[in-house]
């Protein structure tokens, strides 16, 4: 250990060792002390610690690294960190922490800082008094050479103090840290820091290097803090100057020591690098401080350079550069050293090859050279050569990727010397040296270590910096290649290519120089151009093409430069004399061809190019027979297609003639390559005139108008239009067919949505641009679009929304147009609607459009048009309406368009009410969508109109006040039509429209009776002479739910008219229509009429209906009366009289007339059913009604059921009214007596099941069929139980069998198209549901008979195949059926066809396994696909088997309580659901017979096992026969477990009763449950008939099985 001063360690702390660590008396006696990092220290006092902690601390003092690591790990994982808050522990840590923080082993260093993090978290502020003892090693740990240790040290310190508080820490403890690290750096060595008895010398050297490096980096860090702390706001008590003074004092001590400066050339790389960092930082912030020590540094520079290593070279060279930059006068100290000249030092440094990849060594070396200066660095030619030779030698020895850096440094070094040196001899020598390199490079004698492309990049880089070098390169190059003895073809092509590229690159550098005269430019640039032009005519095509491509680059370089006359003349001469022949020789794919355009572009602003260009063109057209000429001519348009030369060169007649002929020859075949045509269009007024482009456009248009175009036509069309853009309106007027182009591109549907659509968009944008400039042109284009689109809409050949969208696009794009420009004119609507109204007048349902009932009171208008024509007109109305609606939704509309739409809406709604495609055979799509969309649109318009208005104002403005606006105008127009004196069909339709729209308004309003009377009074409704107008207004206001005084007055007047003498049906109908309109739809307790007038009214009107209405088939007044009665019932329910009988007669009459397919009849039926339903609910309140209900119950149910079964035959079955009737029928038939159901035959039910698409009707039909089947099965069961001597012969009804046999088709196809085939699949599965219903609550023999029939007809196989497809059982992943019930189903719970079919399928599969288990199991066993059977078993075991097992066990438990088991007291049956086992015990005296039935988990796909447990009183043969008989019922007879138990019980009981068993099967009871009844006449043994039959069949004889005699029946 080195001797050191003691003044640094004077302070003592009670209970603590000194910060210097002067612990032992021995050390004091020797006048030596140890720092707290030394290996020599006094062990800390541990007496106050617990035993476990003492062990840990002592382990930390041991030499063994593993023991230290374990001790530190124990501290890190200490359970109670509060024990660290102990003075003796913290004292001990102050002793151990510095030594552990610099330990040789990195794991120890890492763990000590991890522990410091734990300690910081545990103690926080409590650690503050001890921080001055820990801070130095802690901060030194920041700069540990191991990154993980460094990060751990910083993280642990962050745990104690956040980073924003660190500056205050350095300020407070900086004066403590600096002396210690300085002292450690100067006085510690490997002997003091490492115990060499336990560590190697290398480990000790590494440790001391790491520690000293950390010391220097810590000082660097602290020095940087002095600059950062200048702006730090601190407590006044803390003196910044103290910290700074202490730091400078210790730095001075450090810098004064020779040991510090000796490290400049030290082999300790880490310390040297840290030293350079320290010096650089001090130099940056405080240059004067370094100034006083500069001599110490500079006198060691030569030694430093000679001792640089791979790690130290870059930082030390950077340091030297900075020092020279700051102290330039000091260079002479080492530059003039005769023993160590700089050139020698640096050449040795270069040849040492100490550079690392990407280290920046050569960059730093060049920077150092520039700092030193050329005159100091290379004072003589010899020194230049010495350094150049060193670079070349190193480049040849370096690796390839490093040699590029060496070459680059060499070239930049020469450039630096050439530029910086003032000695002309040295400059000339540099040029000579470079000329030698270039010449050898051209000759291929200069062997490169790196790739040639990398070397070329080096050359380009230095040429960019030094244009003299670029000139030198060209001088050498031209001299080399102009040597007549040199054959260029002998030079490697790659080398030639690179050299020419560098030559052209030098042109760019020459361009950037400011030359004074043209001669000076030509003297430099002329040889280069002449050389390249000469090479471009070389006989070798590769060389010629290479030269041409380089000339192209030259053209690009000078494209933005003003050329001098000699250069222009040189290019023009080359253009005319040499280039055409080169192009013809090399072809249009060569660079020479592109060079033609580039030279023309270069010269276009300097001279008239017409004559030179014509000269060139004539050389190309001199012979059309030569293939080379044709290829060049065909490629010329693509060269000039960019149009840059338009107006710069003139048309050449020979070229125009050629291209006219060529273009139209190509267009004759659409399959040709049309790129040349497109290029010709682009070269307009360069190669071809505008007239040629027009002819191309007109020819292409013909293909478009005939829809016979291909992509080539579109591309050419688009290009032509854009080329002729300036005169487009004039050209369109010249050829009117062009106006048809816009609709074609608007409405075409390109398959290629990208390519073709882009061209369409381009054409549209062009036309739009020109239309905005010319209003006349715009109007003509829009007129064409309007005519085209409206015609296509009417024909149904285009989607209405698409047409509307395109017209809206044109409307918004092509300037100002009237809003109705693209709508159908009023004349169209008048003609179409007028032709359809008479037809629809006979097709309406008055329950849907009540006001249209007035049409019956108007003289019938003859229908003089053909039905097909009516259909066509209606289709036109529909298409026009849908288009108009889409159009006005976007653009808005006026009152006329809305008026026309409303009439169309009425007609289309009637069409829908009749059912889609039930009126006209012409198909109409999206009618429902139109109705919904129009209602939504109309409601939206009403809401807009009503905004910020009260209800009274809204109705006044719509119906009374004369104001503008499309909604008021619309309502006034309908009001005027409906109140006109001359009543026509049109006015009645208008009245219905008024009603519909008033309903929309009324639903959005709230008004009281007073305000309603105000509106009705202003309308003069009570005195109006128009019943249509009165009815339409009152019907429209019904949603307001008010019964005002005026409404009551109108109602009473109508009743008065109907109470007197009634004459014509028309008058009665008018009064009834008004009465209905004046009757509120809400059924309230408030009487509609005074009770005194009700009876007279009912008697009078029912008498008229009975005597005149029904007999004369005047159904309208009867309908109106039944409609009124529905709302009148609460008022008259308590009245009695004969009129109730009449009303029930009308209802029955309506049911009887229901077979007539007429809209008025369907409305009559609906009103009758609705009234009957209301009467049926509360008939107990009125004895007359009750009597009518009871008396007519059976007949009424019969009529209702008959009407129900007729539904599928009605042509109006899809109408809204018919569907409403069906809903009432379903409700009224819920309690239909079984007697009525059984009175109908099966053939009357099944058509309804098969032809109905209504799920509710289908469900009711199934209910009736089950009712009928149940009754018949019960009768059959009773009959065969009485006639027990005969085996039952039961078969399914023929209609059911026919449907089961007539399978609808391929299951795979049907399931894949579920929506299409849903009905067929559903009917088929429902038929099977009915078949399985035969097995419910009947005898086993009857079941067996039906099963045999199914087997005989092979009906089960197609069913199972269908179920496999529906449930996806043939695939690895069957469908998930968890959401579907299995035991029962309700198809109305599901909205999708797929869900309905799957729900029904899983139920049928459940029924199959329940009733036909043996048959299903047999079918699956035939399938040899193991994967399939595994899927089926898995699916069944998860979804069906648990239900079947539970149901079977339930059946057994119920059977135990039945008479069959209770009658035998010795039988005991036990059920164990957990194990799925059934125990059968038969007690015989004190003994018992026991059998067990075990149900598998995949029941019934796996057989139930019947096992004999215990037997007594029977031999083995009989015992096995009973087991086999029970097993047979389960495995092959489709029997249930209950069936097997019953057979087993009877066999045993009859055996012990002495009944003789069959001599073949040894059982008393056969599987058919019959006794042995066939006795042999010889041996007298009895046999079962079935057993005997099987014996005869198998033995092919009729002999007795026992005695072998001929069998004679006894």
UniProtKB/Swiss-Prot annotation:
One Gene Ontology cellular component: RQC complex
Pathway, per record: Protein modification; protein ubiquitination
InterPro entries xref list: ARM-type_fold, LTN1/Rkr1, LTN1_E3_ligase_6th, Ltn1_N, LTN1_UBC, RING-CH-C4HC3_LTN1, Znf_RING, Znf_RING/FYVE/PHD
Chain positions of all zinc fingers (RING-type): 1558-1604
Ranges for the HEAT repeats: 110-148, 314-351, 372-408, 409-443, 590-626, 627-664, 736-773, 965-1003, 1119-1156, 1322-1354, 1355-1393, 1435-1473
Top-rank taxon: Eukaryota
GO molecular function, one term: zinc ion binding
EC number of the protein: 2.3.2.27
Enzyme class: transferase
Subcellular location: Nucleus; Cytoplasm, Cytosol
Matching PANTHER family: E3 UBIQUITIN-PROTEIN LIGASE LISTERIN, ZINC FINGER PROTEIN 294
Family note: Belongs to the LTN1 family.
Protein known as: E3 ubiquitin-protein ligase listerin
Source organism of this protein record: Schizosaccharomyces pombe (strain 972 / ATCC 24843)
Record lineage: Eukaryota, Fungi, Dikarya, Ascomycota, Taphrinomycotina
């Amino acid at each position: 250990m080195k001797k050191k001063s003691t003044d640094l360690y004077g302070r003592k702390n009670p209970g603590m060792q000194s910060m210097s660590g002067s612990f032992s008396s021995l050390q004091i006696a020797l006048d030596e002390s140890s720092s707290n990092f030394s290996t020599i220290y006094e062990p800390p006092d541990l007496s106050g610690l617990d035993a476990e902690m003492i062990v840990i601390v002592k382990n930390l003092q041991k030499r063994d690294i593993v023991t230290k690591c374990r001790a530190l790990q124990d501290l890190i994982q200490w359970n109670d960190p509060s024990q660290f808050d102990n003075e003796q522990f913290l004292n001990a840590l102050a002793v151990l922490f510095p030594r552990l923080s610099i330990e040789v082993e990195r794991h120890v260093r890492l763990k000590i800082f991890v522990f410091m993090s734990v300690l910081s978290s545990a103690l926080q502020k409590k650690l503050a008094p001890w921080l001055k003892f820990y801070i130095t090693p802690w901060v030194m740990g920041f700069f540990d050479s191991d990154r993980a240790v460094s990060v751990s040290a910083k993280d642990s310190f962050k745990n104690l103090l956040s980073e924003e508080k660190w500056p205050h820490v350095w300020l407070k403890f900086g004066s403590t840290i600096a002396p210690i690290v300085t002292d450690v750096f100067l006085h510690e060595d490997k002997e003091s820091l490492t115990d060499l008895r336990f560590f190697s010398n290398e480990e000790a050297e590494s440790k001391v290097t790491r520690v000293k490096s950390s010391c220097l980096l810590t000082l660097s860090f602290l020095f940087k803090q002095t600059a950062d702390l200048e702006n730090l706001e601190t407590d006044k008590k803390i003196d910044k100057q103290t910290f700074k003074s202490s730091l400078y004092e210790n730095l001075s001590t450090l810098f004064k020591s020779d040991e510090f400066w000796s490290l400049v050339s030290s082999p300790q790389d880490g310390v040297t690098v840290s030293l350079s960092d320290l010096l650089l930082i001090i130099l940056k912030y405080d240059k004067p401080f370094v100034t006083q020590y500069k001599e110490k540094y500079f006198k060691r520079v030569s030694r430093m350079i000679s001792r640089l290593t791979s790690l130290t070279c870059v930082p030390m060279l950077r340091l030297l550069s900075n020092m020279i930059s700051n102290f330039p006068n000091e260079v002479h100290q080492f530059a003039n050293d005769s023993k160590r000249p700089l050139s020698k030092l640096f050449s040795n440094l270069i040849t040492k090859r100490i550079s690392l990849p990407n280290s920046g060594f050569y960059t730093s070396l060049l920077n150092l050279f520039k700092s030193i200066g050329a005159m100091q660095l290379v004072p003589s030619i010899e020194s230049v050569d010495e350094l150049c030779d060193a670079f070349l030698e190193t480049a040849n020895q370096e690796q390839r990727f490093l040699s590029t850096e060496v070459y680059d440094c060499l070239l930049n070094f020469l450039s630096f010397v050439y530029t910086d040196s003032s000695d002309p001899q040295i400059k000339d020598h540099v040029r000579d040296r470079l000329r030698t390199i270039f010449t050898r490079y051209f000759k291929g004698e200069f062997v490169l270590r790196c790739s040639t492309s990398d070397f070329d990049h080096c050359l380009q880089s230095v040429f960019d910096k030094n244009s003299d070098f670029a000139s030198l390169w060209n001088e050498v190059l031209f001299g080399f290649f102009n040597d007549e003895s040199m054959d260029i073809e002998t030079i490697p092509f790659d080398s030639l290519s690179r050299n020419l590229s560098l030559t052209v690159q030098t042109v760019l550098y020459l361009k950037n120089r400011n030359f004074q005269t043209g001669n000076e430019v030509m003297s430099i640039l002329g040889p280069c151009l002449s050389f390249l032009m000469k090479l471009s005519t070389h006989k070798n095509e590769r060389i010629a093409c290479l030269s041409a491509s380089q000339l192209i680059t030259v053209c690009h370089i000078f494209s933005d430069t003003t050329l001098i006359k000699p250069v222009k003349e040189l290019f023009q001469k080359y253009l005319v004399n040499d280039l055409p022949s080169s192009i013809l020789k090399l072809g249009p794919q060569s660079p020479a061809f592109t060079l033609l355009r580039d030279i023309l572009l270069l010269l276009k602003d300097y001279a008239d190019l017409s004559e030179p260009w014509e000269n060139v063109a004539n050389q190309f057209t001199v012979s059309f027979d030569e293939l080379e000429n044709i290829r060049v001519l065909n490629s010329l348009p693509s060269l000039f297609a960019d149009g840059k030369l338009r107006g710069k060169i003139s048309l050449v007649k020979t070229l125009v003639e050629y291209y006219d002929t060529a273009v139209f020859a190509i267009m004759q075949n659409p399959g040709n390559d049309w790129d040349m045509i497109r290029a010709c269009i682009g070269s307009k007024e360069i190669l071809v005139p505008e007239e040629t482009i027009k002819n191309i456009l007109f020819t292409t248009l013909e293909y478009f108008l005939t829809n016979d175009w291909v992509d080539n036509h579109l591309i050419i069309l688009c290009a032509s239009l854009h080329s002729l853009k300036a005169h487009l309106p004039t050209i369109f007027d010249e050829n009117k067919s062009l106006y048809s182009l816009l609709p074609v591109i608007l409405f075409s549907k390109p398959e290629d949505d990208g390519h073709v659509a882009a061209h369409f968009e381009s054409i549209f944008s062009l036309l739009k641009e020109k239309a905005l400039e010319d209003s006349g042109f715009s109007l003509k284009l829009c007129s064409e679009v309007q005519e085209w689109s409206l015609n296509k809409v009417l024909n149904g050949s285009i989607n209405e929304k698409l047409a509307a969208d395109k017209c809206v696009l044109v409307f918004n794009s092509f300037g100002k147009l009237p809003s109705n420009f693209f709508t159908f004119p009023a004349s169209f609507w008048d003609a179409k609607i007028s032709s359809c109204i008479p037809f629809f007048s006979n097709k309406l349902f008055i329950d849907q459009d009540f006001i249209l009932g007035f049409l019956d009171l108007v003289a019938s208008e003859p229908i003089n048009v053909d039905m097909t024509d009516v259909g066509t007109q209606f289709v036109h109305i529909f298409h026009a309406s849908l288009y108009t609606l889409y159009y006005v939704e976007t653009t808005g509309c006026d009152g006329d368009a809305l008026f026309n739409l409303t009439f169309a809406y009425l007609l289309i709604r009637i069409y829908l009410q009749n059912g889609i495609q039930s009126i006209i055979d012409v198909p109409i799509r999206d009618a429902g969508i139109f109705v919904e969309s129009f209602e939504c649109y109309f409601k939206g318009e009403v809401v807009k109109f009503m905004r910020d208005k009260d209800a009274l104002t809204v109705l006044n403005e719509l119906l009374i006040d004369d104001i503008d606006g499309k909604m008021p105008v619309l309502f006034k127009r309908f009001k005027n039509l409906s109140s006109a004196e001359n009543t026509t069909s049109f006015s009645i339709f208008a009245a219905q429209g008024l009603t519909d729209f008033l309903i929309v308004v009324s639903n959005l309003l709230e008004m009281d009776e007073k305000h309603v009377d105000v509106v009705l009074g202003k309308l003069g409704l009570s005195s109006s002479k128009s019943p249509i107008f009165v009815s339409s207004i009152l019907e429209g206001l019904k949603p307001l739910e008010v019964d005002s005084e005026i409404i009551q007055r109108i109602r009473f007047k109508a009743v008065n008219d109907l109470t007197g003498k009634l004459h014509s049906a028309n008058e009665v109908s008018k009064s009834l229509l008004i009465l209905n309109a004046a009757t509120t739809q809400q059924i309230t307790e408030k009487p509609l009429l005074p009770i005194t007038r009700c009876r007279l009214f009912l008697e009078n009107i029912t008498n008229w209906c009975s005597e005149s209405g029904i007999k004369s088939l005047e159904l309208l007044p009867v309908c109106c009366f039944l409609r009124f009665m529905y709302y009148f019932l609460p008022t008259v329910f308590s009245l009695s009289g004969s009129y109730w009988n009449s009303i029930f007669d009308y209802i029955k009459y309506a049911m009887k007339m229901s077979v007539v397919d007429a809209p008025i009849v369907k409305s009559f039926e609906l009103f009758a059913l609705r009234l009957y339903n209301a009467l049926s609910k509360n008939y107990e309140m009125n004895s007359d009604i009750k009597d009518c209900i009871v008396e007519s119950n059976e007949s009424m149910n019969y009529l209702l059921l008959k009407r129900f079964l007729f539904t599928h035959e009605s042509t109006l079955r899809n109408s809204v009214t018919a569907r409403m009737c069906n809903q009432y029928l379903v409700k009224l038939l819920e309690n239909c007596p079984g007697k009525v159901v059984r009175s109908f035959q099966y053939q009357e039910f099944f058509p309804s099941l098969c032809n109905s698409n209504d799920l509710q009707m289908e469900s009711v039909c199934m209910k009736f069929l089950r009712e009928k089947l149940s009754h018949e099965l019960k009768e059959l069961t009773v009959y065969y139980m009485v006639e027990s001597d005969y085996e039952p012969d039961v078969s399914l009804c023929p209609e059911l069998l026919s449907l089961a046999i007539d399978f609808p088709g391929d299951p795979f196809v049907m399931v894949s198209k579920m929506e299409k085939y849903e009905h067929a699949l559903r009917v088929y599965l429902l038929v099977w549901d009915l078949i399985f219903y035969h097995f419910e609550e009947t005898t086993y023999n009857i079941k067996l008979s039906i099963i045999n029939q199914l087997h005989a007809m092979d009906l089960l196989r197609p069913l199972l195949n269908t179920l496999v497809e529906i449930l996806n059982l043939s695939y690895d992943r069957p469908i998930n059926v968890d959401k579907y019930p299995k035991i029962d189903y309700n198809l109305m719970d599901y909205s999708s066809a797929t869900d309905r079919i799957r729900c029904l399928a899983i139920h049928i599969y459940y029924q199959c396994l329940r009733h036909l288990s043996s048959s299903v199991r047999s079918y699956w066993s035939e399938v040899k696909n193991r994967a399939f059977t595994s899927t089926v078993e898995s699916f069944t075991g998860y979804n069906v088997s648990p239900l079947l097992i539970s149901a079977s066990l339930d059946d057994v438990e119920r059977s135990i309580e039945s008479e069959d088991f209770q009658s035998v007291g010795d039988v005991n049956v036990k059920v164990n659901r957990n194990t799925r086992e059934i125990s059968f015990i038969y007690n015989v005296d004190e003994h018992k017979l026991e059998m067990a039935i075990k149900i598998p988990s995949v029941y019934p796909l796996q057989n139930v096992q019947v096992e004999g447990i215990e037997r007594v009183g029977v031999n083995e043969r009989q015992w096995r026969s009973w087991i086999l008989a029970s097993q047979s019922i389960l495995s092959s007879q489709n029997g249930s477990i209950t069936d097997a138990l019953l057979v087993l019980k009877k066999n045993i009981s009859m055996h012990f009763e002495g009944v003789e068993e069959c001599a073949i099967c040894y059982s008393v009871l056969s599987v058919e449950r019959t006794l042995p009844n066939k006795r042999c006449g010889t041996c007298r043994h009895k046999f079962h008939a079935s057993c005997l039959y099987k014996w005869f069949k198998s033995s092919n004889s009729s002999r007795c099985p026992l005695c072998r005699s001929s069998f004679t029946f006894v």
